[in-house]
Regions:
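Membrane-interface capping segments at transmembrane-helix boundaries
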Residues: 109-110, 334-350
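Hydrophobic core segments of alpha-helical transmembrane domains in multi-pass membrane transport
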Residues: 78-80, 93-108, 154-166, 262-264, ...
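Long hydrophobic segments that form regular secondary structure
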Residues: 83-84, 113, 117, 127-176, ...
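Single conserved hydrophobic/aromatic residue that forms the stacking wall/gate
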Residues: 1-7, 12
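Juxtamembrane inter-helical linkers in multi-pass membrane proteins
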Residues: 13-40, 114-138, 181, 185, ...
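Conserved phosphate-handling catalytic cores of large alpha/beta enzymes
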Residues: 41-118, 229
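Transmembrane helix-loop junctions at the membrane interface of multipass transporters and ion channels
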Residues: 64, 68-90, 275-283, 300-318
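Extended, low-charge hydrophobic alpha-helical regions
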Residues: 9, 22, 43-55, 159-295
Length: 356
């Protein structure tokens, strides 16, 4: 039934009034719905939006919806830190929806996206049941797409990760190393770990592993779990998974872990989805702006979660706590400041009244 509704676009008719309040078009609903399965077709579905501003904003926000590739990350964090609590997965979808709503409101107040959403006009076809052939073809396309992705991108990146974590310089010579901290991967992770220090990814000297996992997630989100599996030796633990959860729990606090989860949900998607964004934007500057906005938003939200969460749970008050409060104040200002168009309109109306 859902496939039939998506195919006929009947479900977006009642969403237009709601989406317009957030600066989006009702047609943005379909890309976001499809994006819950995979970001690539979700981004491509934005082609149905005629207005260029609305289309670009939809492209930038569609991947905030947790896709299927992000579900293993949600399951891993929920199992390791929150006792498989169901609220973790539920909250991830609410975080994604909140990011879309807030982004729509804030971006619509900028010069790049200013203006009312385009009027919703479309020809509604008759309701129809989805055919079996369409359902099977859709299942095959999505299944085959994942098989190709798993056999190429994920496999290749896993091999590269294995090489980087198995080789390094030890005793002045290059070769296989026994200590993971002497590997090439450790050196790379240590070099970039300081960037994520304000997010709390530094417990017990494990920050470089979190940094590496987050970066490999840009290749494919499934790589986050695969990276942890290689770094913590998931294949060598018991079937009940107790050692897995223990290893991860020793690497981060629960608050930092939830921030890590939110970062991976909101930051730039996988390479395939980024390629789709590049094609749909058809402009390098817009592509870089979209990726930069997604990564920047993910970083700031994760920072606020960790700093404020740590303060509330009895942690210390430091310079990054002040930064977090400043970010929240700035965010609230951008969210609730009046539209410039409304102000100029009021001035014109008052001027016309005085002239009369």
């Amino acid at each position: 039934i859902l496939i039939g509704l998506v195919g006929s676009e009947m479900c977006i008719r009642d969403r237009d009034r709601i989406f317009r309040k957030f600066g989006l078009s009702g047609k943005s609903f379909i890309p976001m719905l499809i994006g819950s399965g995979c970001g690539v077709p979700g981004v491509m579905a934005s082609r149905t939006i005629e207005n260029d501003r609305d289309r670009k904003m939809t492209i930038m926000t569609t991947t905030f919806v947790p896709c299927g590739a992000k579900l293993p990350i949600i399951a891993m964090i929920a199992g390791a830190f929150f006792g498989n609590s169901g609220w973790v997965a539920t909250s991830c979808y609410f975080v994604g929806i909140a990011a879309i709503i807030c982004s729509g409101i804030i971006l619509k107040k900028t010069k790049m996206f200013a203006g009312d959403p385009a009027p919703f006009v479309m020809e509604l076809p008759a309701y129809h049941w989805p055919t079996v052939s369409n359902i099977l073809r859709s299942m095959w396309e999505r299944g085959w797409s994942f098989i190709k992705k798993a056999g190429t991108i994920i496999l290749l990146s896993t091999i590269i990760l294995w090489f980087l974590m198995s080789f390094g310089w030890e005793g002045g010579s290059f070769g296989m190393v026994e200590e993971l901290n002497e590997s090439i991967l450790s050196k790379i992770g240590t070099a970039i770990a300081w960037i994520f220090a304000p997010l709390g990814w530094t417990k017990a000297g494990e920050g470089w592993k979190m940094a590496v996992a987050a970066v490999t997630g840009l290749i494919a989100k499934e790589n986050v779990v695969a990276t942890f599996g290689m770094l913590y030796g998931f294949a060598e633990v018991a079937e009940d998974g107790a050692e897995i959860w223990g290893n991860l729990a020793a690497a981060m606090t629960p608050i930092a872990a939830y921030g890590f989860l939110v970062f991976n949900l909101l930051c730039a998607p996988c390479f395939a989805a980024m390629g789709a964004i590049k094609r749909e934007m058809n402009n390098t500057k817009w592509f870089l702006f979209a990726i930069g906005y997604q990564c920047g938003l993910a970083y700031l939200v994760s920072l606020c979660i960790y700093q404020i969460g740590t303060l509330v749970t009895g942690g210390g008050f430091g310079i990054w706590t002040v930064v977090a409060f400043a970010i929240i104040i700035g965010f609230l200002y951008l969210l609730f400041r009046p539209y410039k168009e409304s102000g100029s309109l009021n001035v014109k109306v008052k001027g016309m009244a005085k002239a009369r």
